[in-house]
Curated annotation (Swiss-Prot):
Keywords: Antibiotic, Antimicrobial, Cytolysis, Hemolysis, Secreted, Signal, Toxin. It comes from Lachesana tarabaevi (Spider). One of its GO terms (cellular component) is extracellular region. GO terms for biological process: defense response to bacterium; killing of cells of another organism. This is M-zodatoxin-Lt8l. Expressed by the venom gland. Residues 21-60 form a propeptide. The keyword Secreted applies.
C-alpha cells in the first residue's frame, strides 16, 4: 500500500510538472491544447470504467468508503467537464453552462461527454488519413 501511495504521488508530481511548462509559440500552444484534450478523453474513459465498477459487490466491500469518495469525485469531474465543453461550444459563461448541466442526469452527462470526445477522436483520425 505504501508503494501505491508513493507511486500515485510521483505520477501526480510529474503530471503537475508537465502541465506547468510554458508553451512558447502558437504551434506549441496548439500541441499543448491537443495533448490536454486527449488526456481529458483518456480521463473520461478511465472514469467511465471506474464508475461501472461501482456496481460490483466485491469492489464495494473491498474499497469501502474510499470507493464512494472516488465515485463522487468522478461525478464532479464529469459535471465540470460537461459545463466547460458547453461553455466553450456555445460561447456562454461558466455559470450559465453549469446551470444547463445541473438538471442533466448522470447518464445524460456521460453520454454527452462520450459523444463529444467520440466526434473529436473521429475528426483526428480522419485528419491523419
Amino acid at each position: 500500500m505504501k508503494y501505491f501511495v508513493v507511486x500515485x504521488a510521483l505520477v501526480a508530481a510529474f503530471a503537475c510538472i508537465a502541465e506547468s511548462k510554458p508553451a512558447e509559440s502558437e504551434h506549441e500552444l496548439a500541441e499543448v491544447e491537443e495533448e490536454n484534450e486527449l488526456a481529458d478523453l483518456e480521463d473520461a474513459v478511465w472514469l467511465e470504467d471506474l464508475a461501472d465498477l461501482s456496481d460490483l459487490e466485491e469492489t464495494r466491500g473491498f474499497f469501502g468508503n474510499a470507493w464512494k469518495k472516488i465515485k463522487g469525485k468522478a461525478e464532479k469531474f464529469f459535471r465540470k467537464k460537461a459545463a466547460k465543453i458547453i461553455a466553450k461550444k456555445e460561447g456562454i459563461t461558466k455559470e450559465e453552462a453549469e446551470a444547463k448541466v445541473d438538471p442533466m442526469s448522470k447518464k445524460q452527462i456521460k453520454v454527452y461527454l462520450l459523444k463529444h470526445y467520440g466526434k473529436k477522436a473521429l475528426q483526428k483520425a480522419s485528419e491523419k488519413l
